Amino acid sequence: MSMKISEKKFNDRVGDGIQDSFMRGAVSSAQTRLYTNRLKAADELGNWEEWRELGEEIRQHTLENLDYYLMQLSENVSKRGGHVYFAKTKEEAAKYIQDVAKKKQAKKVVKSKSMVTEEISMNHALEEIGCEVLESDLGEYILQVDNDPPSHIIAPALHKNRTQIRDVFKEKLGYENSDDPYEMTKFVRKQLREKFMDAEIGVTGCNFAVANTGSLCLVTNEGNADLVMSIPKTQIAVMGMERMVPTMEELDVLVGLLCRSAVGQKLTSYVTVAGPIQEEEVDGPEEFHLVVVDNGRSQILGSEFRQVLQCIRCAACVNVCPVYRHVGGHSYGSIYSGPIGAVLTPLLGGYDDYKELPYASSLCGACTEACPVKIPLHDLLLKHRQVIVEQEGRAPLAEKLAMKMFSMGASSAALYKMGSKMAPAAMSPFTSGNRVSKGVGPLKNWTDIREFPAPSKERFRDWYKDHKKGGDK
């Protein structure tokens, strides 16, 4: 899989999402639960806004000094016996991982959940050279078996219910029991354990990399990442270049923010800090590789969108977004969905494929309020729209013509006067009472769901002319 998960046009994807009543119900229920849990976990601290400000300061400081911390991380990983590779592009990252697999003559690879490995199409790259790649995260495993893309950053199989999952297992894996979650989990555990023991390479993502220790932090609910790191002889960790913290002290703050914002817990079930195996350690890989992926991030870092790199992938913004609630994750056409996806995806994938995403927002600001590191997401969405129109020249033709006509009319007193006089008569076939009941052309999309006032028969200039200052007519 790559970052792009669908070849359908944006409007078609949205249409599919709106028609999927189960998906919308599942998303609504999950959003409500995760939102409520997040508020409770935040309230336990008593000073949530101060924690958010501290998180923002840590992320901004790290990004401002990213070159220094990346170099420090590289030096410390190397001192501990690991190998570090800086990949400028997703192709370079995938090629390096391929080369490691070829060198090890690996045929079986097991991996934990990782967005950046999806971004660089790692699974496809390994399959090209004959490797079998197994997802060990339960949600990702379900989707892999069903050849279905993820719909949520932290809950990738959110759009499926347990009956659908049972049917997938029955059809693809020969599962014969009920749709009881315990029974299905027990079945998957048996499937995965056998694969774990045979895998030559384990691949993980990285929630945070600690610069001054050369270690990585992984946060999971299932413990699968721990097995990926400890059983295979070779481990490859893949991280976006921005996923840095200076020391363990900053890590402590960000992990607390991440867990509370993502699932409403003080800590998730497993928080692991590890790296290359040391002499006194029993468990761990004999060989460790860290792949640091740029893939456009350095360009973002030097742009007006740099604040998006503060993201810690908690999905709090996704869990409060009213647009996501109604259209679902697949509508975004990217592994990154919701408000963060609408900002990040066009930067990584370009406007050619993702120019509609910045408009997939009501600009209500709920995402900005929910973000634990205070990314101004709705402002960045507006900035995208500005770039699309002013720099990219990608505004739809109808919008360009409408704006040009409005500009001509509004800048000419004679045209404006004539237009305001003719408007009531011109719009009368489309009005009912004092409201426009059916719009013309693109306006139909507005009037179908919103009330639009009809032009007044008495213009303000006429009313003003007929009234004396401070008196009546």
Curated annotation (Swiss-Prot):
Residues 302-332, 351-380 form the 4Fe-4S ferredoxin-type domain. Belongs to the LutB/YkgF family. Keywords: 4Fe-4S, Electron transport, Iron, Iron-sulfur, Metal-binding, Repeat, Transport. The gene is lutB. Pfam families: Fer4_8 (PF13183), LUD_dom (PF02589), LutB_C (PF11870). GO terms for biological process: lactate metabolic process. The keyword Nuclease does not apply. Is involved in L-lactate degradation and allows cells to grow with lactate as the sole carbon source. Has probably a role as an electron transporter during oxidation of L-lactate. It comes from Bacillus anthracis. This is Lactate utilization protein B. GO terms for molecular function: 4 iron, 4 sulfur cluster binding; metal ion binding. NCBIfam families: LutB/LldF family L-lactate oxidation iron-sulfur protein.
